[in-house]
Swiss-Prot record:
Protein name (database record): Sporulation protein RMD8
Membrane topology reported for the UniProt record: Single-pass membrane protein
UniProt feature, compositional bias: Basic and acidic residues: 99-121
Source organism phylogeny: Eukaryota, Fungi, Dikarya, Ascomycota, Saccharomycotina
Family matches, as InterPro entries: DUF155, RMD1/Sad1-interacting
Subcellular compartments: Membrane
Protein keywords: Acetylation, Meiosis, Membrane, Sporulation, Transmembrane, Transmembrane helix
Organism: Saccharomyces cerevisiae (strain ATCC 204508 / S288c)
GO biological process, one term: meiotic cell cycle
Modified residues (N-acetylserine): 2
Function: Required for sporulation.
Family: Belongs to the RMD1/sif2 family.
Domain of life: Eukaryota
Amino acid sequence: MSYKANQPSPGEMPKRSPSILVTDARTSKNRMSAPFAGHAAGSRKNMENAGVTKSQGVRSSAIGPSPLQSFTHPRRRSSGRFSDISIDNILSDNSDIPSARREERLSSSSSDRPRQYERLSSRRKMINPLPPRTSKTSQKLVLIPEDDNLNHFQTLPTNALDRQRPKVGSMKSNSFDRLPRYSKEKSMARITAYNVADGFNLNQLYKFLQETHEVSPRLYDECLYVAYTLPLLPGKGGFRIKSNLSKKTMGGKTLIDNLIDTSEQRDHHYEYYSGVETVEDANNNYELETSGNNNNANQDTTTVPDHLPNPVGQQDSFNPMEPQFFAEETPLEIEKRERTERINMLKKEENDSDASCGNDNNNKNNDKSKLYAVEGNDQYVQSSRSPASPSSISTPSPPSSSQNDFDRVYKMHRDNDHEGNDRHAEIFIFHYGVIVFWNFTEIQEKNILGDITFADYKNLMIRPLDEQDIETEQFHFEYDRDTERPRIFNDIVTLRSGDHIIELTLSHAIAQSSKLSRFESRISPILISVTKLPKRLALYGTLGLKREQLLKKSGKLFKLRVDVNLSSTILDTPEFFWSFEPSLHPLYVAMREYLEIDQRVQVLNDRCKVFLEFFDICVDSVAERNMARVTWWFILVILFGVIFSLTEIFVRYVIIHRHTST
């Protein structure tokens, strides 16, 4: 067969030449197809000029043109949408050979680099803000110690404790804890702290609120306590709101004043619970362990001299390194205490009614019957708690005549207390410029702040802050008498009663946290302006600032550090816990640890310390440069003096030479 016989005629289509593509499909991202050997060079040139990259999904779903169309219209094929479609590209990822599979690599194209560079540059421009307290995001749980913890699990074994631990109150609290923020605002009461000024004049504020809002404030050392009766009424004389009228008692005192007096006279016993608590620790079951140890000690008693150390098994139970616990009240003790408070209130009402004139005898008889009912039932409680003989235990004889009356009166007073928690709202005003609201709505809070801000009293607020500089701390709270342990979880405070002394203790820690937030916001712009200086010093070797400018910046940081550690009361324990209620200090510490005040202060001091050290280096370098400049000035002055001396000598020589020549 000759060579001419193998050549195709002009009208025939050229046959495809056999070709083996020895390429790596993983690295050929935009590999073009070559359906015909003779057309490969032209299509490659057109593809390089076009510079078009097609996606893999289009290649797998579209159908390519026929070979005849590709041959007759090569330009249309190179510039069309499906010019890069071939069987090789479609099946490039469906190969059994590992080397033929497409490798996924990170994009290194120039189009992706500017975006990454923009992200990095934007991150470098902004300094990392101060880390917020983790209890806002990590759902931190802190068990608040309280003396009203019912220890009804005390006679149960550990297994029974585990089975009976879930309760209705705790389940309700857990459901509230996991609600979103907008649901909490609608269903739960608010605790909000506002830092609106550098300080308050509490004496002037006492008079202002008493005259305009018709309330009876009380001053506790460095805090002003104000109780409002809900619903609030419109104010008079241009003021926005005022307190509602509280229920009057027979002695002329309001119900809220009696509740406040009762809370102040109540004994509070708290202890801080640290570390990981077991079920026994949570319920304070130390009497069982003590009784068991006493029984074992009675069985095997050995006398140890005083000068010898105690054996390991007979060491004293007191260990100062372990948390100490107060004995919790039993249900009967709680009931007795509440009844005693009711007795005192009823006695006070009876004395006031006897002293006042115009009261009917029917009211006196009713009050006396209530009082006798309370006293009779209280004697029954004492007799039931006192150890007695088996005969007396088997035949108890409660005062049946007064039992029903007492239950009715006691239930009425207890319901009134529970409803009174919802009918009252409270404000705690601290002398360092923080106001803490309890059980107010947001509109009511802003109305009270507006009345205080625009008051006509002089020096009521010391250096008030601008609206954009006001710091807030927001929590939610609820009252639940059935809860096992008062606690705070996910910024929700669960308490058993509306004792304002407990709320005052928690408000101290919340107010200090709000004041610390103000310091954190003050340091942010200072650090942003200072962060550029180390980079400039590393690039150019100079700061471009004078000594006075460096001293001003370092002075701002040092002033902030002094305000945090010395001037403010963030690190100090309030005087209230030293003079009024020392037993409330563990509760204050628990709330303070939840708000992470000590950790935040440490972070603030560390950041200030780093930049102050940098400023010290910069000031030393500037001082060294100034000393070098002064040294050069001295050298120039000495040179000038030498030149002047030489000039004087030369002039003298010339003058003397002229005189001698003449």
